[in-house]
């Protein structure tokens, strides 16, 4: 018995102990990853800023239509109006206007346009400076520097107007496709224009240093040179002539010894059966200027096309009793201290040109030397008016043809010098232009153009409406008003 009991005790000592290990439960992976939350980079909501792209269509409109497209709470674009209703401030920073023509190939005229940031001008006052041809598509893009100079605009005030005026007929001209970008913001969030948060009182500040004296800026000195010309039609020199439509002339602009070719808006002050008085516009920036002009008028007529293209074929004489060259105020300009001298040289009675002798008061040359003080409160224009082109056969000294043909007529040589008047400016670095020696007499300032200018609505834009030619000769029409369709009174009357 004792032996058996001892053997069982030894077996228990040799038997190993069992160890129980409890493994932690494994979490099952998600079958789908969580979608990251997207955030609006431009911002949204009623208490933040927002940027919106908008687009609209305006039209169609006729070739002689005038119109105003407003941008702001008065806009016809529902996207602009809807967003302005939810925000307190806004600014339109980019605009593109595309003109889509629907006119026929035979339509004449152009569409003039202008961005009015004052929101006070009328479409009828738009001058023919920036234009699209009625028959061709066109586009214009405007940045923040043109659309307005204020950081933000109240949502109840218009930022600018897009004005347009057509010089065509009553047929459909086309329509506009307009797109742009508007930034919106509430008064509680000012973005980059926010005032700094108040900090601790820094204590008394030292007095600021005196501002440095301004560096003198060189005064501008520039001008225009060239021989303006337009188109006319004539046949035999014992028949009357007529003029073609006129919308611009080409001149050379010089400044700081740099020369460029520019196109300046032009038209007729008066265009009837008797005569046509041409003029062109000279742009002026804001400021005060001294202007000096020399004109040597000679209405040389040149051939167009054929074997004698560009050759001189005669001249159109002046009427000595009519006005000569004149500088006149246009929009936003005032002329003063006007001094001028004019000279008209008659043709000798024994002189013959194309088998025609000169009758009394038939001028061959019309000259002008003048100076005046020009003041402009904003970017604007003034005009230089040429002597009237006489249409009667008594002034026709052009080589005879069997039928009416188109030719070019020169107005004469024109030289314009413009000197900026600036009290703090240094002397202009270039003053080397020669001037004629003449005693200028103080004369009355010529009357300004009527508001909106005088563009040739009746005769200058549609050939079918002007005094023209037929198989039997020159068509005779009753006299037309001297001025525009609004029948404003002529200041020359």
Curated annotation (Swiss-Prot):
Pfam families recorded: Luteo_coat, PLRV_ORF5
Keyword ATP-binding among UniProt keywords: no
Transmembrane segments: none
Cellular component GO terms, alphabetical: viral capsid
Listed GO MF terms: structural molecule activity
Domain of life: Viruses
Composition-biased stretches (Basic and acidic residues): 484-493
Biased composition (Basic residues): 1-18, 32-42
Readthrough domain (RTD): annotated span: 191-493
Region (Disordered): 1-50, 189-218, 445-493
Biased amino acid composition, Pro residues: 195-215
Keywords: Capsid protein, Virion
Remarks, miscellaneous: This protein is translated as a fusion protein by episodic readthrough of the major coat protein termination codon. It is composed of the major capsid protein fused to a long C-terminal extension called the readthrough domain (RTD). Readthrough of the terminator codon TGA occurs between the codons for 189-Leu and 191-Gly.
Function description: Minor component of the viral capsid involved in aphid transmission. The RTD domain of the protein is exposed on the surface of the particle and determines the vector specificity and tropism of the virus. The RTD domain is not necessary for virus stability in the host hemolymph.
Family statement: Belongs to the luteoviruses readthrough protein family.
Name of the molecule in the record: Minor capsid protein P3-RTD
Organism: Pea enation mosaic virus-1 (strain WSG) (PEMV-1)
Taxonomic placement: Viruses, Riboviria, Orthornavirae, Pisuviricota, Pisoniviricetes
């Amino acid at each position: 018995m004792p032996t058996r009991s001892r053997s069982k005790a030894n077996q228990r000592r040799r038997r190993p102990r069992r160890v129980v290990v409890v493994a932690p439960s494994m979490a099952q992976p998600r079958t789908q990853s969580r979608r990251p939350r997207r955030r609006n980079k431009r911002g949204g909501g009623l208490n933040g800023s927002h940027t919106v792209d908008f687009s609209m269509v305006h039209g169609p409109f006729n070739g002689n239509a005038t119109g105003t497209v407003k941008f702001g709470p008065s806009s016809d674009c529902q996207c602009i109006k809807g967003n302005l209703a939810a925000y307190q401030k806004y600014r339109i920073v980019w605009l593109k206007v595309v003109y889509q023509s629907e006119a026929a190939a035979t339509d004449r005229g152009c569409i003039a346009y202008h961005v009015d940031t004052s929101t006070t001008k009328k479409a009828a006052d738009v001058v023919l400076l920036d234009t699209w041809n009625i028959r061709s598509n066109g586009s214009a893009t405007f940045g923040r520097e043109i659309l307005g100079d204020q950081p933000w605009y109240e949502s109840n005030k218009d930022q600018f107007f897009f004005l347009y005026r057509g010089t065509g007929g009553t047929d459909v001209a086309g329509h506009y496709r307009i797109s742009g970008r508007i930034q919106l913001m509430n008064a509680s969030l000012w973005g980059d224009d926010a005032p700094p948060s108040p900090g601790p009182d820094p204590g008394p500040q030292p007095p600021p240093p005196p501002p440095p004296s301004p560096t003198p800026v060189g005064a501008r000195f520039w001008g225009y040179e060239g021989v303006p010309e337009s188109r006319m039609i004539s046949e035999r020199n014992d028949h009357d002539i007529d003029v073609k439509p006129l919308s611009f002339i080409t001149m050379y602009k010089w400044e700081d010894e740099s020369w460029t070719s520019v196109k300046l808006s032009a038209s007729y002050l008066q265009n009837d059966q008797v005569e046509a008085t041409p003029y062109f516009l000279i742009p002026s920036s804001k400021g005060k200027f001294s202007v000096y002009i020399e004109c040597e008028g000679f209405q040389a007529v040149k051939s167009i096309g054929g074997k004698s293209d560009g050759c001189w074929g005669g001249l159109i004489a002046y009427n000595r009793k009519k006005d000569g060259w004149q500088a006149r105020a246009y929009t936003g300009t005032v002329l003063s201290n006007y001094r001028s001298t004019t000279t008209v040289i008659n043709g000798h009675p024994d002189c013959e040109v194309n088998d025609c002798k000169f009758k009394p008061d038939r001028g061959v040359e019309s000259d002008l030397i003048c100076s005046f003080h020009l003041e402009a409160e904003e970017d604007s224009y003034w005009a230089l008016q040429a002597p009237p082109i006489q249409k009667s056969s008594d002034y026709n000294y052009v080589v005879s043809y069997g039928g009416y043909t188109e030719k070019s007529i020169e107005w004469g040589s024109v030289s314009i010098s413009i000197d900026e008047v600036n009290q703090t400016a240094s002397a202009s670095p270039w003053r080397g232009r020669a001037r004629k020696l003449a005693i200028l007499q103080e004369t009355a300032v010529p009357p300004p153009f009527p508001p909106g200018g005088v563009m040739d609505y009746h005769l200058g834009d549609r050939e079918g409406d002007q005094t023209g030619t037929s198989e039997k000769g020159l068509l005779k029409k009753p006299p037309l008003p001297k001025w525009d369709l609004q029948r404003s009174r002529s200041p020359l009357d």
